Amino acid sequence: MDEDLMGFFDFSKEFKRTEAPKGCISSNFVGLGTEKEKTKPPKQENLGTEYVKEIVDREKQNLESLGIGGSAAKRNRTLDDIDSDNEECYEAPDLRLDEEFYSKYYFDLNRDKTLPIYTQRDQIMKAIRENTVVILKGETGCGKTTQVPQYIIDEAYQNRQYCNIVVTQPRRIAAISIANRVSQERHWEPGTVCSYQVGLHRQSGSEDARLLYCTTGVLLNFLINHKTLTHYTHIVLDEVHERDQEMDFLLIVVRRLLATNSRHVKVILMSATIDSREFVQYFATKNGIPPVINASHGRKYPLVKFYRDQLKNMQWQEDQPNPDEPGMGSHGYSAAIKILLVIDNMERRTEGQSQRSYEENLKTGSVLIFLPGINEIDNMAESIDHVMQENPALKVSIIRCHSLMTPDSQRDVFASPPVGYRKIILTTNIAESSITVPDVSYVIDFCLAKVLVTDTATNFSSLRLVWASKSNCRQRAGRVGRLRSGRVYRMVPKSFYMKHMLEFGVPEMLRSPLESSVLKAKELNMGPPIEMLALALSPPKLSDIRNTILLLKEVGALYPTVDGNYVELDGDLTPWGSIMTRLPLDIRLSRLVLLGYVFNCLDEAIVMAAGLSVRGLYLQEAGFQSYEAYWMHYVFADGSSSDLVAIWRFYKTYLNMCENRIMQESAAQWARRYHISLRSLKEMHLLVQELQYRCNKLRLHPVQLQSCQIKDDRERALILKILIAGAFYPNYFIRSNKFNPDYGRNTYQVLGGYDPCRTVYFTHFEPRYMGELYTRRIKDLFSEAKIPPENMDVNFQVGSEKIFVTFKQTEDEMDQLNLIQVPGRILTDVYKAVRLRIGKQYRPIRVMELPHAIQYVQENKIGTVIEGQWHPPSKPFNAGLMALPSVYDKNMIGYITHIVSCGKFFFQPLELADSITNMSEHINSPKNLSHYVVDAGSITKNLKLLAKRVDDFQRAQVIRVETHSHQYPKFRVRFIDYGDIAVVPMDQLRFMSNQLKREYDDLPPRCFECRLALVQPAALTSNYNRWPIKANEMVRKIAMDGRVEMEIYSLVNNVAAVFIKMREGVLNDKLVEKNYARRSDEDFASIQDHDFRLRKQERSFHVPRAERKQVNEEYLRVSRLPQDADLSPPPMHKCQTVVRLKGPYSPLEASMFSTIRASACKTVRIDPLSVNSVLLDSNPQDRHDQLIVSASVTTSNNNQVLTVRGSTVMPNTHGFGALMALIFCPTVQIKCNKECTKFVSLLAGLGYNPETMEPYYEDHDVVMNLDVNLLEDDVRLINQMRYNIDTIFFKYEGEDAPAVSEGDRSIVFNQLRCLLSRLLSKDRCYIEPHSSNLDNVWEKLDNLEPQSEPYGKRAIFPMHTIPELQNEDTTARLVLQENCKRLYSWRTFDGVLQPLDCKLCNQRLETVSQLRLHLLSQLHRDREKQIGFQDN
């Protein structure tokens, strides 16, 4: 590299000061709530196919010289001589003799004469000899696929002429099975004369192959690489009617090469339902048209078709179907069931008139019902089940058939039904051609289908319901009549079928992404993509081509320019684009693989890409199976909140099973247990192997040096999420922001003050039902989620219809090893509970009406009834005995007795030391230790007893039996007064004497639980929001030193948030300095309690002692954990009323919104199969936005609801989303506030036209408003990262290999790793929200000097221009300080507050409560530091 490159990031150089851009204007909080211009999606310009005519006319001039359809010219040259485009090559070459080959293998010229195709053999061969292109139309089963290539090779054998035939198949399995079948028929060794190739896998020993069966993509890639057809003498394109995108592009290439350098290669097009007129016109020239040969045959059994209007006695209740609104109608299901009843009655009546009995007819009288999707299949099955209950005589066996069915279900499709039952197969269009069931005699066809349609402007796809084509319907009708005559019932009128239904379906090229075709056009290098795609059989719209090219520029496959000049409809191929053409993946998945190579996680990236490419990895099941499947998948996610990480982890498990040679049965059992399709997993495994092979061929290898290996799972988890964020930009979604100052308050109000991280609620329970009687029944509702009843408390609120269920944090620390890991502070049980509702919204329980309930409690003396009002029994509470800190205690001294983590440790106040010592001496007296435990069965869960701790016995409570050995039973116990847990053998346990029980049984613990305040684990150094080991060790060291002084921040639910004081400062701050923690807000309840404590402590000197005691007792009563009465419910026979509870709900259920303009104002939901389908605000105390990245996005038919698939929740690192956008976007404008003192928003995308100021790709422009401080140095670090990524792939002109050697690549990788660590480990200050109508407007930045571009126009990731920030104006700072003083002056006001504005944080404060809590927020405290304010 030259000196400019080496010194590019030398920060010692002087930077030129320039004027910053006129960016966003800060708005007040009220302004944030108004709709802005940016929320409106951009208008899309829809350009049609007008461009096609000019290009097609020009192409025709090239075809004029070729006589397609005329006689073949005399062959007097060899194939090797016709690679030139010279007119002299017009004459056909003489094919060389191949005597040696034919003498090497056995050739039997006797073909199967029973096949219908044989009668047309001579006509077919004559047409092939005399024409360049031949179209062959023959029904399925006529023999065209296997026989026509053999006819050609037989004729070549007879003439001893060289021939080389390639036959394309749309599916891998077809190519393999047909090749093997032909080899078997001809008695050739597999892979010799006849061979196959799928992907890069070619049958071994195929050097002599003269007949190759391959997938469409194999031939297409071969022709693109060689740019000639002359490697083959005959090209047979089978199943051309399917019109997938690869086939349509292959037709373009074949026709172009026929017209240029391959004029004497023979092309045969074959299909069962081909639109011969369309193909004839496509290959026609002035010299003639290709001949069409029909090789169809008659049916063995008759087929009768019925239409809706011909079924007069069905009494249809609906209007005519609407051509523009496909659907089954409200009575579609019942109409189909009527037909089933008619079929059954008809066969019963004709039993005596035919030779077949009714039972025999049932065996061959299966019914195939074509439905558009899985939901419709489920609805139809439910409707049939309902009718069967009403008509016991109708006995049917229902089989579901769709692309995601399990292998067992596939076998059921072909199996005979039980004796006396009729088989009914409910199927999607998969049974049109892929599955043939011989015993089907009836088809009920709703004439509907679902097709995947992609909007190229947004790159969002949707599964749309459409009317099936007539071709589809003919294929469906062909499924009947294999064993006897058949009937087809089409559920549309005949006139509708004839007039409104299309003859053929819409080709894939007109409804699917064009990225692959555009990249292939670039690789073919025969003109711009627009000129190639205009030659398609069905050319796409110009707007679709334009959007596709813009998308390819966005992902780095194309440069924005051609030869250095910007071209909207073209771009030079980048190294990334060249690699993408060689990977059998979607472009974003290819980008994932490329970034895996960059960050040395290639194998992981390949596995995730393969998993996303294979359909049906997860089995789709209903009911409890669906609930269980979700959690089995969640286990593999391992707390990462990532579908992609789950894929990688369960593939690793599968691979280990394969490597350890675990039996096939074990693998099948494992797959069933985790609800994974073993068939799809095997398919994924093959794709992983192919991708690894292709990457190896492309010289994409992981760096093997030890210094480049990822250190641990924590670093790998972070890098994998960075790969995902980079690969799927701009599929960025933000979990709804929480700038509403009442967010925390509202959350707690919904739950009646209970902890939202542990509580869910039901609705629709009227207060009159005396809910405390049914707590156990309510707990039983969670049995499906396997949540033990003792792990929850059920509470009610007076006058409310809600039921609150609060889950307990397990007492057993070993549960941290639980298979289900969830992120953040929320308990796993909350996720389990909310997931229950997704499967079933209503939960019934049986209750008594009020008069009967009152009578019941009075008879059984449960609680008290006062003036007709029932008061359930409650446990006594003595605040004076609690070890908890008083509301007036700011600091406490004592001992840390047990440490789980920085987020959970136990503290004994020094003031209780004497009483604890006395109690210990009393307990350990010989008299009180004489009550030995001799029977392990007498030890029950939650029993209080004495257990040995170190040298003495202490109070303990049994958690569970640890071992069941009769000789050495052990028990897991929690020491009540110390907080620790231990496994204690039975001989170290003692029962409490009656005297000890009276004295200590009801005595509250002599310690209380604590956690560190205003900090949480740093995402960069922790997994699952768990505290790093080194952080916990710092707490242990302090505890071992003896007495500890703590400052109490708050007390909520008996847990104190504290600051631990050290000689060097405060532990909380030290953890932040060492990057073990980051600063964090407290949740609403904690801040509210802190404010309450502050105000009480400020006035404590003026409060009498008695009043202080009373205030503290009430304070501790409110702060304690909820406890229910846990009463036995009334007998079921007395509970005659059924209440349908709705829920459970959590107020932390989060919504999210898209960051790109095309998705503005659209509802976003997560795929129900995703591990993130239960999306909760896992850190409700954190006011920052959190990024969610999606591998793909689908949209509803009305284009208003987006479904996120393959989602990953990014680390809760403040500013993570903005940093990822800056690293991986094509270009960005960083916008400042009006004073130019800070960056406030990003506008990322492809940029804009400097002449018109119009954005290049407005639909995909991303706007991100910053909520943390981003500095100029951060952008410089990001520019270094972008430079390093480009360096890895940079090639010198004329070179095939990158300029970076393997050794240099390791240096680049370690630099990237170091830069990432520096970027993400910063503890960023909060900034106030800014929002402006200019956020989404690209602005001219002539006053900013652009950054130097080391790679010029060849940069995939060009350098970002960095606006220069100004120092904050002193006058403005004084104004903000004055505003701050005014806010503090109103803090103690007790009246009604006039609304105030916090100018520091850009927020409107409506009440004193809002004001107080805002002043304690991390945002406000950070802003105070930034302006140098201190409250006196």
UniProtKB/Swiss-Prot annotation:
Q: Which residues form the Helicase ATP-binding domain?
A: 125-292
Please give the chief subcellular localization of this protein: cytoplasm
GO cellular component terms attached to this protein's record: nucleus; P granule
Return the InterPro entries for the record.
Answer: DEAD/DEAH_box_helicase_dom, Helicase-assoc_dom, Helicase_ATP-bd, Helicase_C-like, P-loop_NTPase, SNase_OB-fold_sf, Tudor, Znf_C2H2_type
> Keywords for this entry?
ATP-binding, Cytoplasm, Developmental protein, Differentiation, Helicase, Hydrolase, Meiosis, Nucleotide-binding, Oogenesis, RNA-mediated gene silencing, Spermatogenesis
What catalytic reaction does the record list? ATP + H2O = ADP + phosphate + H(+)
Annotated Tudor domain ranges read: 936-999
Please report a single Pfam family linked to this protein.
TUDOR
Residue ranges the record marks as coiled coil? none
Q: Motif DEAH box located where?
A: 238-241
Q: Which domain of life is it from?
A: Eukaryota
- Can you say where in the cell this protein is located? Cytoplasm
Q: Which GO terms describe its molecular function?
A: ATP binding; ATP hydrolysis activity; RNA binding; RNA helicase activity
**The protein's role, per its UniProt record:** Probable ATP-binding RNA helicase which plays a central role during spermatogenesis and oogenesis by repressing transposable elements and preventing their mobilization, which is essential for the germline integrity. Acts via the piRNA metabolic process, which mediates the repression of transposable elements during meiosis by forming complexes composed of piRNAs and Piwi and govern the methylation and subsequent repression of transposons. Involved in the repression of LTR retrotransposon copia.
The entry sums up its family as follows: Belongs to the DEAD box helicase family. DEAH subfamily.
The molecule here is called Probable ATP-dependent RNA helicase spindle-E
Species this protein is from: Drosophila willistoni
